[in-house]
């Protein structure tokens, strides 16, 4: 049994090619597994990327497929929207090695605010055509056929000649954005995105507009002002209005009980009669004084009400019943005649507070 086992082992070894040994076959098959083939271009992958479904393709092949259907070419699973911006590279070191290049020169195509380096396969095709003196050559990029015009140094799609992009042959060490649409550094990615947006003027304009709006909002608001410790509305009156208001307050303070009573009536308050009164008002004199001073006193009362309306309403529906209640109060007094009555007068001070005075 042991000899049979050895014979089988020897037979399996003899099945290998004569120019290779078992150790050599194992060492040679390992690297071949690290270079997958692309099911789209049917060639070895250039900058292979892995989709969420674990299928591997060339980055440019996935880019072309996403333009057409945004689905995997094998299982039809959807490709994420941000996959082209953040692809899953199988060998990031290969990308950096490709940016350094193998020779002295490399081929580039024009991008926004910079140049992109062609992938290794396309660069070899361009260099071969250039060295042979060809005027143009065709390239398969992202599933589309492009024509490289080596005389005018432009490239365009074979079925769309209107859109042209500059190309050039330059040294390998020039500043570049990346290789075949893949950026070399994440930090550079952020900087370049900001510069591209600012070059268009969209982000810069929106940023300036946002700043102007933020600056305009606080300038339109004013702090609350105070009159004798009481807050008033944010709208500040003119200097003339402030002077007239102060004069009216001083006039109200110097006036007697008759002025306070008339201001009380002007606000729509009703008189409260009491049998224990000690004064008989002279209605004829009061009516004459009220008629003479109504024009001078009603104005400051209205101004004071307007300045304190937003903070504290004094008496509701006062302006609607001024004339009616004034006439009614005069009638009640004339009917009372020489009788005795007591009036509780509530006058308003300049600071907005009310006091009750017995007469």
From Swiss-Prot:
Keywords: Cytoplasm, Isopeptide bond, Metal-binding, Nucleus, Phosphoprotein, Transferase, Ubl conjugation, Ubl conjugation pathway, Wnt signaling pathway, Zinc, Zinc-finger. Can form homooligomers. Interacts with PARsylated AXIN1, AXIN2, BLZF1, CASC3, H1-2, IPO7, LIG3, NCL, PARP1, XRCC1, XRCC5 and XRCC6. Interacts with DDB1, DHX15, IQGAP1, LRPPRC, PARP2, PRKDC, RUVBL2, TNKS1 and TNKS2. Binding often leads to interactor ubiquitination, in the presence of the appropriate E1 and E2 enzymes, and proteasomal degradation. The WWE domain mediates non-covalent PAR-binding. A zinc finger (RING-type) spans 38-76. Residues 197-243, 261-359 are annotated as: Disordered. There is a cross-link at residues 86, 96, 132, 177 (Glycyl lysine isopeptide (Lys-Gly) (interchain with G-Cter in ubiquitin)). The gene is Rnf146. Ubiquitinated; autoubiquitinated. Autoubiquitination is enhanced upon PAR-binding. It is an enzyme of class 2 (transferase). One of its GO terms (cellular component) is cytosol. Its EC number is 2.3.2.27. Residues 93-169 form the WWE domain. GO terms for molecular function: poly-ADP-D-ribose binding; ubiquitin protein ligase activity; ubiquitin-protein transferase activity; zinc ion binding. This is E3 ubiquitin-protein ligase RNF146. A glycoprotein binds at residues 109, 112, 116, 146, 155, 165, 177. Pathway: Protein modification; protein ubiquitination. Residues 284-298 have a biased composition (Acidic residues).
């Amino acid at each position: 049994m042991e000899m049979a086992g050895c014979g089988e082992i020897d037979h399996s070894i003899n099945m290998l090619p004569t120019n290779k040994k078992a150790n050599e076959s194992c060492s040679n098959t390992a690297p071949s597994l690290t270079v997958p083939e692309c099911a789209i271009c049917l060639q070895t992958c250039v900058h292979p990327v892995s989709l969420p479904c674990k299928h591997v393709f060339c980055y440019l092949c996935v880019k072309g497929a996403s333009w057409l259907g945004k689905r995997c070419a094998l299982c039809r699973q959807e490709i994420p929207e941000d996959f082209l911006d953040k692809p899953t590279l199988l060998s990031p070191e290969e990308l950096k090695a490709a940016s350094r290049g193998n020779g002295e020169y490399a081929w580039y195509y024009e991008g926004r605010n910079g140049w992109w380096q062609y992938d290794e396969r396309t660069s070899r095709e361009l260099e071969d055509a250039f060295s042979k003196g060809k005027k143009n050559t065709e390239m398969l990029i992202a599933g589309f056929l492009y024509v490289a015009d080596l005389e005018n140094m432009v490239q365009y799609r074979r079925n769309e000649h209107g859109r042209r992009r500059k190309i050039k042959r330059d040294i390998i060490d020039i500043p570049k954005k990346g290789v075949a649409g893949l950026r070399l550094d994440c930090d550079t990615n952020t900087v370049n995105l900001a510069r591209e947006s600012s070059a268009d003027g969209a982000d810069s304009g929106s940023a300036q507009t946002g700043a102007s709006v933020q600056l305009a909002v606080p300038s339109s608001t004013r702090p609350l002002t105070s009159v004798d410790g009481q807050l008033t509305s944010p709208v500040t009156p003119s200097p003339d209005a402030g002077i007239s208001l102060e004069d009216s307050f001083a006039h109200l303070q110097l006036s007697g009980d008759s002025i306070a009573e008339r201001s009380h009536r002007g606000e729509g308050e009703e008189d409260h009669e009491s049998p224990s009164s000690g004064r008989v008002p002279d209605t004829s004199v009061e009516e004459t004084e009220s008629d003479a001073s109504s024009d001078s006193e009603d104005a400051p009362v209205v101004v004071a009400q307007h300045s304190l309306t937003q903070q504290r309403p004094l008496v509701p529906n006062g302006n609607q019943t001024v004339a009616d209640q004034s006439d009614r109060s005069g009638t009640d007094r004339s009917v009372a005649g020489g009788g005795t009555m007591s009036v509780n007068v509530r006058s308003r001070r300049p600071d907005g507070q009310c006091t009750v005075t017995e007469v």
